[in-house]
């Protein structure tokens, strides 16, 4: 039987696996993912299916835009997953397979997959959707992103909003709970994007001031 790790133990493992400084703007993301993944790993009803994998990889990619150095991003995800008992490469593969399986399906076809879901008879479907999986905000984002892949055209955002909420009950979750987590995700993403823009502006201003100081100190000027 696998030993259950505490959040503190998971964080200690993370720092061993990722011996670098996490920039301040990304620390909250790392902490929250470690806590949530640690809790999910200890839930008997939880399955790391395609919807979960899509949600986790999407959250990580969305919230680490602008992360520097770029070559540490993969190591960061691996460390977050490893310290909580998951495999980053495995989840990325599951997410890829789930996206391929869902590609081209409309909302009604996805509903049929959920309704007909049976692990023994449809293993490939089970990897995409595990109905009544233990709920988490990561799965909420996975549902949202799954539907977003099917939406297109000028009203893509509106179509996604309507369709993902229509799909929620089929997963066995309440609309209010999922909508709250998706809205929080969007709000948090907007805040971090603005924070990154501000950081970039400050960096440019500092470079400009340094250049001006160097120019003023040159002989004959």
UniProtKB/Swiss-Prot annotation:
Keywords noted in UniProt: Coiled coil
Coiled coil: 174-213
InterPro entries listed in its UniProt record: Thf1
Pfam families, alphabetized: ThylakoidFormat
Biological processes annotated in GO: photosystem II assembly
GO terms for cellular component: plasma membrane-derived thylakoid photosystem II
Disulfide bonds, paired cysteine numbers: none
Domain of life: Bacteria
Function: May be involved in photosynthetic membrane biogenesis.
Entry protein name: Protein Thf1
Natural source organism: Prochlorococcus marinus (strain MIT 9211)
């Amino acid at each position: 039987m696998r030993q259950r790790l505490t959040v503190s133990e998971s964080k200690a493992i993370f720092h061993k696996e990722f011996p670098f400084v996490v920039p301040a703007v990304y620390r909250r993301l790392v902490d929250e993912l470690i806590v949530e993944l640690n809790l999910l790993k200890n839930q008997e009803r939880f399955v790391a299916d395609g919807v979960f994998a899509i949600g986790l990889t999407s959250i990580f990619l969305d919230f680490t835009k602008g992360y520097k150095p770029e070559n540490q991003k993969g190591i960061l995800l691996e460390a977050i997953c490893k310290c909580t008992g998951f495999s980053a490469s495995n989840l990325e593969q599951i997410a890829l397979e789930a996206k391929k399986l869902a590609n081209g399906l409309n909302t009604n076809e996805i509903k049929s997959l959920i309704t007909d879901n049976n692990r023994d008879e449809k293993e490939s479907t089970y990897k995409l959707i595990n109905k009544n999986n233990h709920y988490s905000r990561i799965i909420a984002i996975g549902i949202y992103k799954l539907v977003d892949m099917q939406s297109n055209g000028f009203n893509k955002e509106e179509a996604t909003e309507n369709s993902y909420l229509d799909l929620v009950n089929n997963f066995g979750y309440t609309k209010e709970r999922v909508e709250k987590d998706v809205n929080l995700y969007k709000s948090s993403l907007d805040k971090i994007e603005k924070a990154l823009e501000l950081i970039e502006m400050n960096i440019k201003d500092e470079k400009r001031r340094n250049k001006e100081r160097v120019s003023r100190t040159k002989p004959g000027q």
